[in-house]
Amino acid sequence: MKFIIAFFVATLAVMTVSGEDKKHDYQNEFDFLLMERIHEQIKKGELALFYLQEQINHFEEKPTKEMKDKIVAEMDTIIAMIDGVRGVLDRLMQRKDLDIFEQYNLEMAKKSGDILERDLKKEEARVKKIEV
């Protein structure tokens, strides 16, 4: 009788674990939705950067004071947003329940933001050097 109960419990455990398809590798839905939102914002940021690059190229051809002020203001806004995201990522990285996959995603998002901020500051310095 004990053998039958043990076999039944083991079979039930295997069925509940293996029969479920995971749509993502996150421990809970909140983490999945948060990272999905971060990735959406990164895509929007990339499009904004392409637009900003077009503005910089146009500014180099025909520099005006208004264009320079607009570009510098947009760069300052993007850098401030990156700083805000860095704070959120730092708080998330302090959690003790993250697995390796989640830690890797957070670290990569933070490093990407650092690289982007560094490049934006270089571009901003280059734009500020152009005489109007």
UniProtKB/Swiss-Prot annotation:
Q: Name one GO biological process term.
A: protein complex oligomerization
Pfam families, sorted: Blo-t-5
Q: Would I find Manganese among this entry's keywords?
A: no
Give the Gene Ontology MF terms in alphabetical order. Answer: protein homodimerization activity
The protein's UniProt keywords, in alphabetical order, are:
Allergen
**Coiled-coil portions:** none
Spell out the residue ranges making up region: Immunodominant conformational IgE-binding epitope: 25-53, 102-132
Report the biotech usage: Non-allergenic peptides identified from the mapped major conformational IgE epitope-containing areas could be used for the engineering of house dust mite allergy vaccine.
Q: Which domain of life is it from?
A: Eukaryota
Q: Does the keyword Methyltransferase apply?
A: no
The entry's family comment says: Belongs to the mite group 5 allergen family.
Assembly, in brief, is: Monomer. Trimer of homodimers. Oligomerizes in a concentration-dependent manner.
Q: What is this protein called?
A: Mite allergen Der p 5
